[in-house]
Design a protein with these regions (language model features):
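Glycine-rich, N-terminal phosphate-binding loop of Rossmann-like dinucleotide-binding domains
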Residues: 9, 105-106, 254-255
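Beta1-alpha1 glycine-rich phosphate/pyrophosphate-binding loop at the start
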Residues: 1-72, 170-205
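A Rossmann-like FAD-binding core segment of flavoenzymes
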Residues: 73-76, 80, 96, 180-278
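FAD-site-proximal beta/loop scaffold in flavoenzymes
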Residues: 128-155, 237, 244-312, 319
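Rossmann-like dinucleotide-binding core of oxidoreductases
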Residues: 159-205, 213, 224, 308-321, ...
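FAD-binding core/adjacent interface of flavoenzyme oxidoreductases
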Residues: 70-159, 251
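C-terminal auxiliary extensions adjacent to catalytic cores
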Residues: 341, 347-381
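A conserved FAD-binding loop/helix module that cradles the flavin
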Residues: 295-345
Length: 381
């Protein structure tokens, strides 16, 4: 009997649960370790903020999925992995041994971007603790957004600043501006939303046409884009040129950083802490370990840490875990040359990005809505 430990219920891991449900493996004893029975879907976060979805619409219940797959669900936070000893330790002190390990625990928000420009200075000052909200973990953000919205609507003036110009930062800014202004009405002119990101960091990797569409949408929504970097100071945000940038709340959409316990695991990792895997998503150093989603990296330049690749890699991960347990051949996951990105723009409007092609409109939002709801339904039992 092989012991299979699944860590995290991310997009790729959902495919593993589905595969185990389709073909119960009598020779595998599997357990899923995750902090919560709910897996939140990041693709629907902007729609939740904008008011199009309830929180319950945006999450997957892992309990029936695990039960259907014959997988034990153990609620807990992984905090330590000793890869050479094949041991996983949880926050409450218990440990799990494994023969086969599948990692899809996601990542953390890279708050180092906001840290003061002093060697070794942490983002731990009182102002940041009170005013900076990281996008991850998602469950925390989903819980806090209604409180943030209530504070903004109760104040005579309120400035919400999103730091980060990637797709996540843009979507959050547009969604927040739409929600706050719709709830406040025309009589409340004191709510402002801005985005802090260097010009080159606004939607990096997307075609110029997409960036132009998004720039126009931000302007039409009354969102100020400040093309500078910033760091957290004792009295607020400081721009790269030294000026104070007052904000009542800062949402950090500053990209992802590797989870520290994986960096210390003994697995082969990149310089910035991501687990290195090959095209089969097998660890380059420990063949009994597989990883997918935000926690890993590949040498393939087409591969990026995104939900798109995590979803597409899922079936390959599922096949390879079972194949490795049985001594069978592994499959490769080959990323597509271009990935489709659908960028929500606040109201029921979205921008499509695929290579150099782009489009926008209500029909793109309906397309995105259909894809997102289908993903939730496909993982519901």
């Amino acid at each position: 009997m092989k012991k299979l430990v699944l860590v995290g219920g991310g997009h790729a891991q959902l495919a593993v649960l589905q595969a185990l449900a389709r073909q119960r493996a009598a020779d595998i004893d599997a357990v899923l370790v995750t902090p919560s029975p709910w897996q939140y879907y990041s693709g629907m976060l902007p729609g939740f903020i904008a008011g199009h979805y309830a929180e319950a619409d945006c999450r997957i219940d892992l309990r029936p999925l695990a039960k259907a797959a014959g997988v034990r669900l153990q609620l807990g936070q992984a905090v330590e992995l000793a890869a050479d000893e094949r041991q996983l330790r949880l926050a409450e002190g218990s440990g799990l041994d494994y023969d086969l390990l599948s990692l899809d625990p996601g990542s953390a928000t890279d708050l180092d971007t906001l840290a003061p420009p002093v060697a070794g200075a942490p983002l731990a000052d009182p102002w940041a603790a009170e005013h900076v909200l990281a996008v991850k973990p998602l469950a925390h953000f989903f819980a806090l957004w209604p409180q943030l919205q209530a504070r903004a609507l109760a104040a005579s003036t309120y400035h919400l600043c999103i730091v980060g110009g990637g797709a996540a930062g843009v979507e959050l800014a547009l969604a927040a501006a739409h929600a706050l202004k719709a709830a406040a009405g025309t009589g409340h002119a004191g709510i402002r939303v801005s985005v802090l990101a260097p010009a080159a960091a606004l939607l990096p990797g997307h075609a110029q046409g997409v960036r132009a569409r998004v720039t126009r949408r931000l302007a039409d929504s009354g969102i100020l884009v400040v093309p500078q970097r910033a760091h957290s100071g004792t009295d607020g945000l400081r721009l790269a040129d030294g000026r104070l940038y007052p904000a009542d709340c800062v949402i950090a959409a500053t990209g992802a950083r590797a989870l520290p316990w994986l960096e210390r695991s003994g697995l082969a990792c990149s310089d910035d802490g991501w687990i290195e895997v090959g095209d089969t998503h097998q660890s380059l150093s420990h063949p009994e370990v597989f990883a997918a989603g935000d926690c890993c990296t590949r040498l393939d330049p087409r591969f990026a840490r995104s939900g798109v690749h995590a979803v597409h890699a899922g079936p390959v991960l599922a096949h390879n875990l079972l194949a490795h347990a049985r001594g069978e051949a592994l499959r490769q996951y080959t990323p597509r040359r271009h990935s489709l990105y659908l960028i929500a723009c606040g109201p029921r409007w979205a921008i499509a990005s695929w290579g150099r092609w782009s489009a926008q409109g209500r029909w793109v939002w309906r397309w995105k809505d259909w894809i997102d709801r289908r993903f939730i339904r496909s993982n519901s039992v």
